[in-house]
Regions:
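Glycine-rich phosphate-binding loops of nucleotide-dependent enzymes
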Residues: 2-257
Length: 257
């Protein structure tokens, strides 16, 4: 960990017509940390993730990942650089199985040409073996062996969220962006997801940026926090500092923590 910055955002500004979604947001993500981005609904949290992974292009500012300027890089290229993403609402292939959803995510690592893939020759066959090994390891890691052949659209919400996490892990990211991974879950499901998130961080060595509204869980698992309000950063620090920050209490936390 000789680098002090895994990702660096500087003065990121984004607007939609007359709506200012982000206003000069700057922060760093350090290698190997869990960083939480919190704030009220409409604060700009998801818009910020969309800028990082190439879904949105900021009006101004810069985003640098591992020395590469990615501010205006297309989303598929950013994924190939090592940034993966989950969403508030699961974005899975609901007609496919858990296994096939995870295999579909491996496309950015495919090197065989189209003819080889169609005929399943040589490099395509060897690649398929590797991709399946990666996916099967993730299925074991997330404890979803019992649903590996199940059609995703028929799964309960909590398991679909776990499959989506698995699909992101199938990209083998060095930076993983999690947009409300526990939304819609009951307490037991939230605790399971928190455990998997910590395992991704500790056992797979993945750097994480997390958006989540359950402040109890966020305070427990995040190492640092960035707080947004009306598209502006109003605070940054370790959880205990954020917990007692007057501006954050007024804008978002209240007496909840």
């Amino acid at each position: 960990m000789h680098e002090t910055r895994h990702l660096s955002a500087r003065n990121v500004t984004l607007s939609f017509g007359g709506l200012q979604a982000l206003n000069g947001v700057s922060f760093d993500v350090h290698p190997g940390e869990i960083l939480a981005i919190i704030g009220p609904n409409g604060a700009g949290k998801t818009s910020l993730l969309n800028c990082i992974n190439g879904f949105y292009r900021p009006d101004s500012g810069s985003i640098v990942f591992e020395g590469y300027e990615v501010t205006r890089t297309p989303a598929h290229k950013i994924a190939s650089l090592g940034i993966a993403r989950t969403f508030q609402s699961t974005a899975l292939y609901t007609g496919l199985s858990t296994l096939d959803n995870l295999l579909a995510a491996r496309h950015i690592h495919m090197r065989a040409n189209m003819l080889q893939c169609l005929l399943y020759w040589g490099a395509a066959h060897r690649e398929d073996i590797v991709h399946r090994q990666v996916v099967e390891e993730i299925i074991d890691f997330l404890e979803i062996e019992h649903i590996r052949k199940a059609v995703v659209g028929a799964l309960p919400h909590g398991l679909r969220k776990r499959v989506e996490l698995g699909r992101a892990l199938a990209l083998q990211p060095r930076l993983l962006l999690l947009d409300e991974p526990m939304t819609g879950m009951n307490q037991e499901e939230k605790e399971d997801m928190a455990r998997f998130i910590l395992d991704v961080h500790e056992k797979r060595g993945t750097t994480l940026v997390l958006i989540e509204h359950d402040m109890g869980l966020v305070m427990d698992i995040a190492q640092r926090m960035v707080v947004l309000d009306f598209g502006m950063k109003i605070a940054e620090g370790i959880p205990d500092e954020i917990r007692h920050n007057e501006a954050v209490i007024k804008a978002y936390l209240g007496e909840a923590v």
